[in-house]
Amino acid sequence: MKFPKRYAIVLLTFMCTNVCYIERVGFSIAYTVAADAVGTNQANKGMILSMFYYGYVLSQIPGGWAAQRLGGRLVLLLSFVLWSSICAVVPLDPNRVILLVLSRLLVGVAQGLIFPSIHTVLAQWVPPQERSRSVSLTTSGMYLGAACGMLLLPSLVKNMGPQSVFSVEAMLGVAWLLIWFKFASDPPRTDLPKVASKDKMKVQTGGIMAPRTVKIPWARILFSLPIWAIVVNNFTFHYALYVLMNWLPTYFKLGLQLSLQDMGFSKMLPYLNMFLFSNIGGVLADHLITRKILSVTKTRKLLNTVGFVVSAIALMALPLFRTPSGAIFCSSVSLGFLALGRAGFAVNHMDVAPKFAGIVMGISNTAGTLAGIVGVGLTGRILEAAKASNMDLTSSESWRTVFFVPGYLCIFSSFIFLIFSTGEKIFE
């Protein structure tokens, strides 16, 4: 039996997000070690860690536009060429602040093109009844990549130094772009001359036949309440994710006096849980929809609400647990249920605007990236303020605000999605 092309595309996009998150987690691990070795303070660490997101936010909407016009395949190739080259040539020296700032900005710009392009590709290739699990599988690559990075890269840093992480990331990026170049292709075009070809394309693309020159309804998109429900939840999801991804190593080291190198397999559990729950959410959503157990709207709202509310509870419990096992448990539950919630808001843009999925994803991910800028930088300042107030960073009080802020945001965002979201197509 021939392997359907759309399955190959989904598998390749899964590998894409996997490699990208190995890079992101790898930088936070390697830079934290290098910065601590030279005595960099927490505010400056937060500034460098957040630079990626300043670049990332600049290319979200242009990335969606470029994918719509040029095709997601080409834009993904260009992205990987740029960020892999930077990883290959830039030295990881915390004292060379300007070079680090510029390099992280450029890596952010390059990777900001990725998710709008991926969602454009998936909206074109994947039929509606397979979208939840396809998007969930693709995005679960992020979490598996983060899990692999947390498991393997601390040992690499310990044995070969922080710079070795950059080299490995560059090699992984080049390997993926070569595979993508060879096996990926743009979807069938809409300008095929025969009706039979058009009918075939409808089956392959789920009826999404908008040509690349279609007029984009910018005003309607920007003033749509269901779109804003997606945007708000994307912001909150990424605020919580990026705070944990960038500051969890510091929390283990300073808050719990525990080295990542000594944690073994347990340090990858939060991200492995995200991988599992993301796919569970996608399969469950498709099951509820295809079996007509719930409508698309009710399915999205149910999974989004359960995911965000449970995550909020676990986030606010995190600083109260003063043992490594308690912290791992809370962070695993929080991130796992956040990933489950992606079967709500993160697929919803393909429900409401399938022809403009890349554009809506670009807008939504812009908000998510702003969350990275705000959350990662703000956390560094919160910790510095705690130190200035003579609070001990080993105490739970100094970390309470760090984890309570995303917890409250999760509760607020779940209500916004319940009130304003829909699973119906609103943009033809």
Swiss-Prot record:
Q: Which GO terms describe its biological process?
A: monoatomic ion transport
GO CC annotation: what is one? plasma membrane
Q: How does it sit in the membrane?
A: Multi-pass membrane protein
Q: Where is the signal peptide?
A: 1-22
Parts of the chain that traverse the membrane: 47-67, 74-94, 98-118, 137-157, 164-184, 221-241, 269-289, 301-321, 327-347, 356-376, 401-421
Organism's domain of life?
Eukaryota
Keyword Membrane carried by entry: yes
Q: Respond yes or no to whether keyword Secreted is given for this record.
A: no
Q: Which UniProt keywords apply?
A: Cell membrane, Ion transport, Membrane, Signal, Transmembrane, Transmembrane helix, Transport
Q: Which GO terms describe its molecular function?
A: phosphate transmembrane transporter activity
Q: Cite the SUPFAM superfamilies for this sequence.
A: MFS general substrate transporter
Q: What does this protein do?
A: Probable anion transporter.
> Which family is it part of?
Belongs to the major facilitator superfamily. Sodium/anion cotransporter (TC 2.A.1.14) family.
Protein name (Swiss-Prot/TrEMBL): Probable anion transporter 6
Q: Give the gene name.
A: PHT4;6
